[in-house]
Amino acid sequence: MVDKLTHLKQLEAESIHIIREVAAEFDNPVMLYSIGKDSAVMLHLARKAFFPGKLPFPVMHVDTQWKFQEMYRFRDKMVEEMGLELITHVNPEGVAQGINPFTHGSSKHTDIMKTQGLKQALDKHGFDAAFGGARRDEEKSRAKERVYSFRDSKHRWDPKNQRPELWNVYNGKVNKGESIRVFPLSNWTELDIWQYIYLEGIPIVPLYFAAEREVIEKNGTLIMIDDERILEHLSEEEKARIVKKKVRFRTLGCYPLTGAVESEAETLTDIIQEMLLTRTSERQGRVIDHDGAGSMEDKKRQGYF
């Protein structure tokens, strides 16, 4: 009986139902894999949904080439251990133009390497449904997004042209060229995610745990020195301000656009305790969310995750 399930078990059952529904309803679904904690939980739920069989769809990473090195190592390890069918896509036009977050800024870099890259990959493989790990508690534009988020033939999201979702009934009807973005974790919170990771023993990128790391403060955000490329874009005065601090990440993206937070949380229980006390959004460290008022909604209207 549903009323005997714990809060997390109810969320788990809802997410598994959504994942199975998509697998049964759509011709060519794909699971977007950004390597972060939400992707880890979503992938775990998908494997549970079809256990002991394999996933009936591939996972796809839209690579900007600016993720943390630990994220790439973790991705490759998980793919090998789980036997996943991984598709990686890098926007060739962005690479040819040398697009990067330093020279071109966060907005242009995100649009070309993430949004346009995603649209290219979806078109190339003809996917009609794409799972994403977004949650409604993350950000205000995501709070009004449906579980089945309808996208037109150009992958655009129109918040005024979405379908009603009553109880657990979802309308997946699409015409040729249209698609659905599916968010099985819509009703989860950041705390739910961490508690589930703890209870299920889900592996995550070590960057989520506090450790001594080299960082530089830029515009009030602690940016980690992840590889040599960032040094090419720092002045000598800025290089002199590089310090070691005990930090961790609440959210992961392109490393020059993702801020760390000072923390002592070295274990999952520490992180959960920290989440119980925090009053700030996990996305406060995402530079792309501060490009302008309504910037996330604008990005989603153009086809962003």
Swiss-Prot record:
InterPro entries: PAPS_reduct_dom (IPR002500), Rossmann-like_a/b/a_fold (IPR014729), SO4_adenylTrfase_ssu (IPR011784), Sulfate_adenylyltrnsfr_sub2 (IPR050128)
Family annotation (CDD domains): Sulfate_adenylyltransferase_2
Keywords: ATP-binding, Nucleotide-binding, Nucleotidyltransferase, Transferase
GO molecular function, one term: ATP binding
Keyword Nucleotide-binding belongs to the record: yes
GO biological process: hydrogen sulfide biosynthetic process; sulfate assimilation
Catalytic function, reaction form: sulfate + ATP + H(+) = adenosine 5'-phosphosulfate + diphosphate
EC identifiers of the protein: 2.7.7.4
Pathway: Sulfur metabolism; hydrogen sulfide biosynthesis; sulfite from sulfate: step 1/3
Pfam families in alphabetical order: PAPS_reduct
Name of the top EC class for this enzyme: transferase
Family per similarity comment: Belongs to the PAPS reductase family. CysD subfamily.
Chain's role: With CysN forms the ATP sulfurylase (ATPS) that catalyzes the adenylation of sulfate producing adenosine 5'-phosphosulfate (APS) and diphosphate, the first enzymatic step in sulfur assimilation pathway. APS synthesis involves the formation of a high-energy phosphoric-sulfuric acid anhydride bond driven by GTP hydrolysis by CysN coupled to ATP hydrolysis by CysD.
Quaternary assembly: Heterodimer composed of CysD, the smaller subunit, and CysN.
Stated name of the protein: Sulfate adenylyltransferase subunit 2
Upper lineage: Bacteria, Pseudomonadati, Pseudomonadota, Gammaproteobacteria, Pseudomonadales
